[in-house]
C-alpha cells in the first residue's frame, strides 16, 4: 500500500491505580508457567526501557505508568500490522521473533490478562481494550476476530468528522471504565483520525497491614536540595519486609496487598537516585520478590496522589518503535479502505497512595517486635515504586515520586 497521505489512528492507554486490589490469591496452575515467565521477563525489559526514557527526558518530574497497559495496546496493534511495522512493534516489546512465534506472543498476553482479571472480592483489577472506528470505515474481519479472542476487545462506531462528539464518546467510555478516576483523556483529535484504540486498567488495592490514619501527620519532603514541601506522612511501627541494599545504595521496602500483588518501594541515599536508576535491573526485582524476610522497623511513607500523561510517540521512538507513526506504516491488516498510520498515542496513569487497608470492624492487630532498636525508614526524599503481580512476577506499574504534591 503506497500513498502520500495516511489517515490517523489514535492509541490510548489509560491507567488508574488506587494503591491500597488485585489478583486472585492462588492463580490456577497451568502449563503456562513457562509462558508466564517469558511474558514477565519481556514486560520487565520493556518497563525499564520506558522508565529510563522518561527519566532521561526529565529528572525533575514524577513518573507513573503501566508497561502492561502500553504493551497490551501495542500487541493489539501488531495484529493489524505487517512486515517491518509488525516486526518493530514486537521487537520493541522485547520479543525475539526467531524464538517466540507471534501466535505464542498473543496467547501469552491472553493468559496474562485472564490471570489478572480473575474476580477477587478483596481486590479490584480490571483491564480492557476497545476500538473506536469511524462509521465509514470497514475493518478486516480477521483483525476484529483476533482482537476479540485474544484481548476481549469490543469495537464501537463513531463519527470522527464530529470531533467533539467523538472525543466525548471516548472520554466517557474511559471515565466509566476507570470508575471516574481518568477523565478527559483525549484533549484533542487529529482532523484525520479514523480509528482509536483504547486500553485501560483500573486497580484498587488494600494493604495487608494498613496504616492508622490517626498517626498520619504533616512532615517535610525534600524534592531536591533547594525545594522542600509539606506532605501528610503515614507512620507505622511493626514488622516489615525492609532491608538496605548495598548494590543500589537504597532502602528497599516490600508491602503486600490483600490478594496477589506487592508494592516495592526503593529509597536511594541522598544524591544516589541516578546510581539507582542506572543499576536497578529486573534481576533485583526477582530477588526481592523471592527472598522475603521481615524485621521490626519504623516506616514513614507519604500519602499522595500523582498522575502522568505521556505522548507515547516521544517515549517509544527511542525504543525503536518509529515506523508505525510514519507514512510508511503498514497497518493494512486493520483496514484496506485507507492507508493508516498511528497519528497519536496517549497514556495516562493515576496513582493514589493512602492508609486504607482491610475494614476490620473492632479488630486490632498486635505485632511482637524484638527488643533491639528498629531502623527508621523515612521516605522523605524521591523514591521509586514498582507494583508487581506475585504469581507471574510481572511489573504492572512503575514510577518515581519526585514531588508528592504535584
Swiss-Prot record:
Carbohydrate attachment residues: 59, 96, 260
Keyword entries, A-Z: Glycoprotein, Phosphoprotein, Protease inhibitor, Secreted, Serine protease inhibitor, Signal
Main localization, broad class: secreted
Bilayer-crossing regions: none
Signal peptide range in chain numbering: 1-24
Annotated positions of the Phosphoserine modification: 33, 372
InterPro entries, sorted: Serpin_dom, Serpin_fam, Serpin_sf, Serpin_sf_1, Serpin_sf_2
Annotated GO CC locations: extracellular space
Any one of the GO BP annotations: response to cytokine
Notes on the domains: The reactive center loop (RCL) extends out from the body of the protein and directs binding to the target protease. The protease cleaves the serpin at the reactive site within the RCL, establishing a covalent linkage between the serpin reactive site and the active site of the protease. The resulting inactive serpin-protease complex is highly stable.
Protein family (similarity comment): Belongs to the serpin family.
Stated role: Inhibitor of serine proteases. Can inhibit elastase, trypsin, chymotrypsin and plasmin.
UniProt name for this protein: Alpha-1-antitrypsin
The species this protein was found in: Meriones unguiculatus
Amino acid at each position: 500500500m503506497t500513498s502520500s497521505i495516511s489517515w490517523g489512528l489514535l492509541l490510548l492507554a489509560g491507567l488508574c491505580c488506587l494503591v491500597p486490589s488485585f489478583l486472585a490469591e492462588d492463580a490456577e496452575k497451568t502449563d503456562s508457567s513457562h509462558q508466564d515467565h517469558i511474558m514477565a521477563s519481556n514486560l520487565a525489559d520493556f518497563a525499564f526501557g520506558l522508565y529510563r526514557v522518561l527519566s532521561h527526558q526529565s529528572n525533575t518530574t514524577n513518573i507513573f505508568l503501566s508497561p502492561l497497559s502500553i504493551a497490551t495496546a501495542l500487541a493489539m496493534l501488531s495484529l493489524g500490522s505487517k512486515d517491518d511495522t509488525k516486526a518493530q512493534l514486537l521487537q520493541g516489546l522485547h520479543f525475539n521473533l526467531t524464538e517466540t512465534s507471534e501466535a505464542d506472543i498473543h496467547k501469552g498476553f491472553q493468559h496474562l490478562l485472564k490471570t489478572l482479571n480473575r474476580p477477587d472480592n478483596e481486590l479490584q483489577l480490571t483491564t480492557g481494550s476497545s476500538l473506536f472506528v469511524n462509521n465509514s470505515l470497514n475493518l478486516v474481519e480477521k483483525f476484529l476476530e483476533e482482537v476479540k479472542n485474544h484481548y476481549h476487545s469490543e469495537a464501537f462506531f463513531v463519527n470522527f468528522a464530529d470531533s467533539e462528539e467523538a472525543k466525548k464518546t471516548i472520554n466517557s467510555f474511559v471515565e466509566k471504565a476507570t470508575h471516574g478516576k481518568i477523565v478527559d483523556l483525549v484533549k484533542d483529535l487529529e482532523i484525520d483520525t479514523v480509528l482509536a484504540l483504547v486500553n485501560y486498567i483500573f486497580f484498587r488495592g488494600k494493604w495487608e497491614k494498613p496504616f492508622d490514619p490517626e498517626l498520619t501527620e504533616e512532615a517535610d519532603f525534600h524534592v531536591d536540595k533547594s525545594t522542600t514541601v509539606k506532605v501528610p506522612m503515614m507512620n507505622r511501627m511493626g514488622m516489615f519486609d525492609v532491608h538496605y541494599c548495598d548494590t543500589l545504595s537504597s532502602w528497599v521496602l516490600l508491602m503486600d496487598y490483600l490478594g496477589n500483588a506487592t508494592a516495592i518501594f526503593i529509597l536511594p541515599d541522598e544524591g544516589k537516585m541516578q546510581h539507582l536508576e542506572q543499576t536497578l535491573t529486573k534481576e533485583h526485582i526477582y530477588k526481592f520478590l523471592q527472598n522475603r524476610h521481615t524485621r521490626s522497623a519504623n516506616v514513614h511513607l507519604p500519602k499522595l496522589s500523582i498522575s502522568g500523561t505521556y505522548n507515547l510517540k516521544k517515549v517509544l521512538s527511542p525504543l525503536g518503535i518509529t515506523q508505525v507513526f510514519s507514512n510508511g506504516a503498514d497497518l493494512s491488516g486493520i483496514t484496506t479502505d485507507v492507508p493508516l498510520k498511528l497519528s497519536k498515542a496517549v497514556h495516562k496513569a493515576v496513582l493514589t497512595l493512602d492508609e486504607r487497608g482491610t475494614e476490620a470492624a473492632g479488630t486490632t492487630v498486635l505485632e511482637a517486635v524484638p527488643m533491639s532498636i528498629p531502623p527508621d525508614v523515612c521516605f522523605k526524599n524521591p523514591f521509586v515504586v514498582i507494583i508487581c503481580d506475585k504469581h507471574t512476577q510481572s511489573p504492572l506499574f512503575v514510577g518515581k515520586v519526585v514531588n508528592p504534591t504535584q
